[in-house]
Amino acid sequence: MRISILGLSLDQKRATYNNETKKKAIVPDEVTAGKPRVAIRVPAHETCHGLLKLLSYPIAAPSANLYGRISPTSADHVKEQLNNRISYILDGGNCSKGIESTIIGFEKDKILVYRLGSTTLEEITKATRTSVEMVKGSSQLEKTPETSGMVKHHYAPNTPMFSLDDLNKLDDLSNCGFIGFDSINSNFNTAHQFILSNNGDLDTAASELYRSFHVMDARKFERLYIEWLPEKGIGRAINDRIKRAIQKTKT
């Protein structure tokens, strides 16, 4: 499973947790972005596991992209954004899941989901046998978010992006791109389209989402249009990322 945790040890069989997640003085404010709680990332990749086993101390694990920009799914994406800002890139290949980890925390007997991600609500419920509740966004949370990924606009390409629902039939689409779920859209030039999954598989679509943002952004279209995916399983997290990318254009 790929998940970021506020005080939880989670596997497919059982869950144990400690509600005391306030950071100790040994943890620098820079690691928690000034927040009082510690979040623990649980990586799924064997290369990261190997690195952690070699070290005798914990490591901070910020995102490998600039704030508000498209998340990377390959070492090339990281280099594109962070070149000359970091000394090394540990290349473990392209991301298998594509979108970020799920972020969860606890309140009494409930599991709170702060950010939808590659571990689905269904998987968390099955593993923990505990009720799961989404943390709803608010204007205050957007100003001082509890965790990463909670601001209204995020993960966005530089090219203005719109939902397919915003398409006006009178619009000139000759220099516009389209990101679709599983089929070509006749309103757009076929060569201007990126299909996330030819067979309609949500996991494949998730793994391709950010790559589609990078590829289509590089083509310098006037506008990008994207369609919503089925609101189930990992599709919820994909739609969350689409919503935040579109919001940048609206603001």
Locations of regions flagged by a protein language model:
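Active-site-adjacent structural elements in enzyme catalytic cores
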Residues: 1-251
